[in-house]
């Protein structure tokens, strides 16, 4: 069960937040939403978030070469852009979705070392997550891939970013 609430009732942080999320939010019935900060950008650069300021980071990293997200996003983006570019010019100014910082293994864009590029961007993303986490904070992520190589890339990049593995819960 969900409830749509007006942003005014949700205590939006400021007018710019209201413009970004529209005038309603979908929340579980009975829960009072807290203040939120919405930002769009790369996980490799979270400069808008202070160091050691977050308790928990929850994410779902890209799946190596399995899914090229920005190319799939272009299908929807070009249509959404027609409607939203005047209201959100900072997000819909480009003709297509940005692809230069997409953390995927894509031989068409990185012909020499696509897997190394993927791992390098994952490491940069994890380093930013590590920087913003409070001491004792936790990173939780889900990763679903049937091949070993992407798992190795994810784990190596986690360790290179300063994390250690505490628990895994494999899905069978």
Question: Residue locations for each model-derived region?
Answer:
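Nucleic-acid modification enzymes, centered on SAM-dependent nucleic-acid methyltransferases
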Residues: 1-50, 66-111, 125, 145, ...
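Conserved proline-anchored active-site loop of SAM-dependent methyltransferases
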Residues: 48-72, 129-132, 141-144, 158
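Glycine-rich phosphate-binding "P-loop"
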Residues: 110-118
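A short glycine-rich, Lys/Arg-flanked "PGG" loop and its adjoining helix->strand segment in the class I
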Residues: 119-135, 156-161
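Short glycine-centered segments of the SAM/dcSAM-binding site in methyltransferase folds
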Residues: 138
């Amino acid at each position: 069960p969900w409830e749509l609430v007006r942003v005014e009732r949700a205590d939006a942080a400021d007018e710019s937040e209201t413009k970004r999320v529209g005038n309603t939010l979908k929340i579980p019935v009975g829960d009072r939403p807290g203040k939120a900060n919405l930002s769009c950008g790369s996980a490799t650069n979270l400069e808008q978030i202070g160091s050691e300021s977050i308790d928990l980071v929850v994410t779902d990293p890209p799946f190596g070469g399995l899914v090229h997200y920005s190319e799939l996003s272009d299908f929807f983006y070009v249509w959404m852009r027609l409607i939203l570019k005047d209201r959100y010019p900072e997000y819909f100014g480009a003709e297509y979705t940005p692809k230069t910082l997409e953390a995927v293994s894509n031989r068409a864009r990185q012909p020499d070392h696509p897997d190394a590029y993927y791992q390098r961007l994952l490491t940069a993303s994890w380093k930013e997550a590590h920087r913003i986490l409070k001491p004792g904070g936790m990173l939780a992520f889900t990763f679903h891939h049937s091949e070993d190589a992407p798992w190795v890339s994810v784990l190596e990049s986690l360790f290179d970013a300063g994390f250690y593995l505490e628990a895994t819960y494999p899905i069978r």
